[in-house]
A protein has these predicted regions:
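N-terminal secretory signal peptides
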Residues: 1-7, 18-23
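C-terminal region of N-terminal signal peptides and the immediate post-cleavage residues
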Residues: 24-36
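Amphipathic alpha-helical segments
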Residues: 122-141
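Terminal "cap-and-tail" regions of soluble proteins that handle hydrophobic small molecules
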Residues: 36-109, 231-306
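Terminal, regulation- and interaction-focused segments at domain boundaries
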Residues: 107-128
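Glycine-rich portal/gate segments that line the openings of hydrophobic small-molecule binding cavities
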Residues: 148-221
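Short, surface-exposed coil-to-beta transition loops
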Residues: 114-116, 221-227
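A short, structured loop/turn motif at beta-sheet edges
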Residues: 123, 200-205, 229-238
Length: 306
């Protein structure tokens, strides 16, 4: 508890610096602006969104989560003794094999909030997910395809969608800024994608691992790690997702992005950044819903816009 209070005070100082920078830079959009105005978050799809070439994939609601996710969400947390430590993540997401618990939530022995979700995806390949992560963050409407109920806003540090690059290089080394509901709480997140091979993952041909640091769009603070491993199975692929939260570290402030985030309106206070079991449980459901929803039409989206 004392450590959490110390971290909360440290985040407060970081937040103050970020917000001060936001005021100085003046890059703040109106939180209640029209949906198609720059730097605006909004629910659902705007009339302009409906004119985009991928509009036929826009659903009014997110598809339900798979049954194993529903069962885990309704059940108790996984005991700490059964949760791999973050240091074992590379072994947990090995190129072959499986883990005793592939879908669940809980807290590690060292206090990290942990989430695991396995999603079976007929007709989907790892290459489709590498393409998706390089394609979706440049427009909020694309991001909303993933979870139309909860996703409100997306932007990318460097738009590489038109660059002559392999799909993985469009997002690795890049930062995605998103506003989304995870459970009842509106989060403003900065997700910095990193090279999985450089971080010790085995990524054979036909597989991928999407690996990144999860941080705040407002405060210069990272709060955890995420990894999505995609492996082929008969008829499609499986995604094995892992989240470890309450892994705090400071990062270089981005005052312009902080100003933009503040300008989009209120969200979860970065001073209350610690993830409890309820937050982990909500993230389990959110991940299960969005991965299952997008997988239903990702092959068609990929063939049309790759």
């Amino acid at each position: 508890v004392a450590r959490q209070r110390y971290l909360t005070r440290r985040v407060t100082l970081s937040l103050g610096a970020a917000v001060a920078g936001a005021v100085v830079t003046g890059g703040v959009g109106a939180a209640n602006a029209e949906p198609d105005a720059p730097n605006t978050r909004y629910r659902g799809y705007s009339d302009h969104d409906r004119t985009r070439p991928y509009a036929k994939y826009m659903a009014d609601r997110t598809a339900p989560e798979p049954a194993p996710v529903s069962a885990a969400y309704a059940g108790p947390p996984t005991p700490a003794a059964d949760i791999p430590d973050f240091s074992a993540l590379r072994a947990d997401l090995a190129a072959t094999g499986s883990s005793p618990i592939e879908t669940g939530y809980g807290r590690t022995a060292s206090g990290q909030a942990w989430v695991a979700v396995r999603t079976e995806m007929p007709r989907v390949t790892a290459a489709m997910w590498d393409w998706w992560f390089g394609w979706h963050s440049s427009e909020s409407a694309r991001y909303k395809l993933w979870h139309p109920d909860a996703h409100l806003y997306a932007a990318i540090a460097a738009d590489r969608t038109a660059a002559p690059l392999p799909d993985r290089e469009r997002y690795v080394g890049n930062i995605s800024y998103v506003d989304e509901y995870i459970g009842p709480k509106l989060q403003q997140l900065a997700i910095a994608f990193q090279d999985p091979i450089a971080h010790g993952f085995d990524v054979p041909e036909g597989q991928t691992v999407v690996f990144g640091r999860v941080g705040s769009s407002v405060a210069p603070l990272d709060v955890g790690r995420l990894a999505h491993q995609v492996r082929p199975i008969p008829g499609g692929c499986e995604m094995r997702s892992r989240f470890y939260l309450n892994m705090w570290s400071l990062r270089v402030p981005d005052l312009a992005r902080a100003a933009d985030a503040v300008g989009r309106g209120p969200s979860v206070d970065p001073r209350d950044i610690a993830a409890d079991l309820d937050a982990a449980r909500d993230l389990l459901l959110h991940c299960g819903q969005e991965m299952n929803h997008l997988a239903r039409f990702l092959p068609e989206l990929y063939r049309e816009f790759r």
